[in-house]
Amino acid sequence: MENCIFCKIASGEIPSKKVYEDDKAIAFYDLEPQAPGHVLIVPKKHYDNVTMVDDGALMGHLMQVASSVAEQLGIKAGFRLVINTGKDGGQSVNHLHIHLLGGRELQWPPG
């Protein structure tokens, strides 16, 4: 998508602090971290949000990436995955992305 910041990051047009990349996904540190370990896991193919995804294998792959990145960051013993969907769900960028949060004790409910 032409004006999508995550599409531009995925294509390399905009730099990011990458922690993972393959042909389907990229993971990079969030610019406004909410935890010591806060990484965004983003499919390279543009989907506005999770309701647009019709590829179960891709969603499974994104979960595997999350697990791998959590291990890489040393937070596999405790982390949270969050997918905000739509404006009311707190989605700020209209490109599906998964927040991986860890590195400290996380509270529940989150808000």
Placement of each model-derived feature along the sequence:
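HIT superfamily nucleotide-processing domains
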Residues: 1-111
